């Protein structure tokens, strides 16, 4: 093989790799801290649903996750999707991002930038900025539903710094008729509601992560999606993410 031909083949291969990379949307995780008891939250919930459905940012795959906090539950309406763990997670972000306090609705983009869930302009700018950040490859495989439990395998590429791997089982869609509280009399819709959220493991600097996870599901709910992401320690920047739909299947509780 001549040097010219070898050089030409290598050039074509390099261009092919660049094209493939350019065609792969960059995953950007959008966490929305929300509550059915908060009158400012429904517009943010609608915004999250729009982002999920339309994917408006070229070159970006927005991976949305609704995390319902519980500090509104004593204000006239108990949100059935609320979980104190999300209140704690939001407070950790408030400490990390040096905020005076937690609030709803709040968006956190890739663990690095926060904004009001109703500030669409600031959020959109954060999505654009996140697109250029390097990301670790992350894959979800071998998913299996059985007796109200989801099992899956998670693999990542080498991480640039030590990181935690989180996995969330999220309900695709839900609706509620709120009877009391600030949203009393209103019909609310949600998307990607986190129902189970666990830390799957850790990866050391320069190493890849590979592990199996087992998540308990809420019976008779569905369909679901599985979301995984790699996050720097102490709820730092999210450096990789993936989402896998479970289609139209529901999870059923075993006997």
Where are these regions (language model features)?
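Short active-site neighborhood of thiol/selenol oxidoreductases, capturing the structured segment around
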Residues: 24-39, 65, 167
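Sec/Tat signal peptide C-region and signal peptidase I cleavage site
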Residues: 18-22
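Short, conserved sequence motifs used for protein processing/export or organelle targeting and
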Residues: 78-106, 112-255
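Short, thiol/selenol-centered motifs that function as redox-active sites or metal-ligating centers
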Residues: 35-45, 80
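Thiol-based oxidoreductase modules, predominantly thioredoxin-like and allied folds used
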Residues: 58-87
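Bacterial N-terminal signal peptides
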Residues: 9-17
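Typically the conserved alpha-helix immediately C-terminal to a functionally engaged Cys/Sec
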Residues: 42-56
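Bacterial N-terminal signal peptides that target proteins for export
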Residues: 1-9
């Amino acid at each position: 093989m001549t040097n010219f031909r070898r050089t030409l083949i290598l050039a074509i291969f390099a261009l092919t790799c660049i094209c493939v990379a350019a065609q792969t949307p960059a995953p950007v995780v959008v966490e929305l801290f929300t509550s059915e008891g908060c009158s400012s939250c429904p517009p943010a919930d609608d915004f999250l649903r729009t982002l999920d459905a339309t994917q408006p940012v070229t070159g970006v795959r927005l991976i949305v996750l609704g995390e319902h906090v519980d500090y509104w539950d004593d204000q006239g309406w108990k949100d059935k999707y609320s979980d104190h763990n999300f209140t704690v997670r939001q407070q950790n972000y408030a400490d990390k991002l040096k905020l005076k306090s937690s609030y709803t609705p709040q968006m956190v983009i890739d663990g690095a930038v926060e904004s009001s869930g109703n500030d669409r302009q600031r959020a959109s700018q954060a999505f654009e900025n996140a697109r250029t950040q390097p990301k670790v490859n992350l894959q979800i495989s071998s998913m299996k539903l059985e007796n109200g439990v989801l099992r899956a395998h998670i693999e990542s590429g080498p991480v640039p710094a030590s990181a935690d791997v989180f996995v969330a089982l999220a309900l695709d869609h839900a609706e509620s008729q709120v009877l009391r509280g600030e949203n009393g009399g209103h019909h609310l819709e949600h998307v990607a509601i986190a129902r189970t959220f666990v830390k799957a493991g850790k990866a050391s600097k320069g190493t890849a992560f590979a592990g199996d996870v087992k998540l308990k599901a809420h019976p008779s709910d569905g369909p679901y999606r599985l979301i995984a992401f790699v996050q720097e320690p102490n709820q730092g920047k999210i450096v990789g993410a993936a989402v896998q739909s479970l289609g139209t299947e529901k999870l059923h509780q075993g006997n």
